[in-house]
From Swiss-Prot:
InterPro entries: MenaQ_synth_MenD, THDP-binding, Thiamin_PyroP_enz_TPP-bd_dom. GO terms for biological process: menaquinone biosynthetic process. Catalyzes the thiamine diphosphate-dependent decarboxylation of 2-oxoglutarate and the subsequent addition of the resulting succinic semialdehyde-thiamine pyrophosphate anion to isochorismate to yield 2-succinyl-5-enolpyruvyl-6-hydroxy-3-cyclohexene-1-carboxylate (SEPHCHC). This is 2-succinyl-5-enolpyruvyl-6-hydroxy-3-cyclohexene-1-carboxylate synthase. It catalyses: isochorismate + 2-oxoglutarate + H(+) = 5-enolpyruvoyl-6-hydroxy-2-succinyl-cyclohex-3-ene-1-carboxylate + CO2. Binds 1 thiamine pyrophosphate per subunit. Its cofactor is Mg(2+); Mn(2+); thiamine diphosphate. Its EC number is 2.2.1.9.
Amino acid sequence: MDSDYSDKKGVSVLMDLFEMKGIRKLVMSPGSRNAPLLFSFSRNPAFEKYVIADERSAGFFALGLALASGEAVGLVCTSGTAMLNYAPAVAEAFYRGIPLVAVTADRPAEWIDQDEGQTIRQEGAMAGFVKSYCSLRAEFDTSASAWYANRRLNEVLNHALMPRRGPVHINMSFCEPLYGTSSGYSGKERAITFVRERQELPEEVWDMLVKRFLEAPRVMIVAGFYPPDEDVSAALQDICKFPHTVLFAESLSNIRTDTGICTADRVLAAAGEDESLYPELLISFGGSLISRMLKTFLRRAKPAEHWGIDERFPAPDTFCALTHHICTGASGFWKEFAGRLKDKAPESLSPEGISYAGSWQKIKRKADLLHRTFMADAGWSDLKAFEVILRHIPHDAALHAANSTPVRYLQLFEHAHYAGGEWSNRGTNGIEGATSTAMGFSEVYSGTTLLITGDLSFMYDSNALWMPYVNGRIRVIVMRNGGGGIFRFIPGPDSLKELETCFETPLEVPVREMAGAYGWRYMKAVSAEELETVLPSFFASGDRAVLLEVETPRFENAPVLKSYFTYISGESYPVNR
């Protein structure tokens, strides 16, 4: 090792293993106790380093880097509450299978709870949402302690990288002095390579699955959030040629087929309570669903069989009907399944089965017509703004949507398939971190990264605006709608006298001033006509990040959306749209 590196042997071991296991991107936050990690990683040319002061923003920035690159990303912070600020991003990564490696510096164990500054109980603090954890001293006194550190670091890092991938936590305690350097350590560490047996389902299992699929009178495939995968889309396109099979693919599934339904809420609103639409066989994959209507429909349907394709163990029983947990990757499963169904034909289909997909397509056409009719003269609102925005997003974009309202509006519109995919932090569904995640994504993605966020979510993550990694490819649309507007739409809070003070929490967001303070270009639209005019220049290439404020009427957004669903469901014709 170069003499410019830390003399703490644990730092050298960690750097070597990071490099050997392909963890080359690191997001670091300033501090004193993590100084050996900071200056050592900074001086090592093998790593791409990002320094972000706010640990919560840093965690989500790393999440965005990992999403865009498909690689594991390291995090480095100092001791104390700095580590706790990683928790939201680490929890999000846990529920989405994203490999983040959180390395937290700590004080010596003997000083915990002894009124030492920046000293808290860090060990196991994130145990509930990491795949693996270890706590080590940065100094090794014996060959046995060096072996132990090497082994534990290998084990934890392998957990992050093995299927299903996910976050891990390495807590490393440092004694003073912290700034010493040494050339006495070789740095040639042992890497334990993880080799997993190729997962292949037995032939008898494939035969059973094919047989059950062909025998089932009504099959529904449901896709939750999933990274873009053209092979999966192609396989599902072939499978959905069977007349007894329908695909519901959420916008975040990044699945695009000719016949798949990607607007679940409006189609289900038009479907009503027709029990003949209930599936006999349900096959699901991907992450959690946005659509509460779809979850409710499937729980009510109680399908006779539900296959969950999921690498997690145990698999979630979201619809209270799970009968088969197929513990394998969705991409390989669908490609193999489509190949085995080639030249097959459904067996003994009932009249309902023969027309199952056709029945859903008929309802979809009805819902589409009602949607177009409603939107043709819909008043200015969030709903209208999303219709306009989605017409202008360039094909090369990566679309990020914040929680909770923006990601739901996306599902009401059929829109283009964007080259960079569609994303949202739906592992935990929190409003924090949306801007930081999009910023991290834009560091890797060469096209336009667009974030659509609400004003409350925007303010919640405003520290992202002053990161030093703002580039000319990032575009942010802030829906200025007066706070947590979703609470005016969902049943319950809208009837309480505490709606504004405890739920919606309206606020005046100084969007223009914030853009100016941090060097962003600023635009604004307060009508559909203004939005149509400003969007081409908003998306035009340039060397500055651009922030567009879209102001909509706070008290009209929820009535318009409620009126929309009333109209789609055919209950009545809206008086005021």
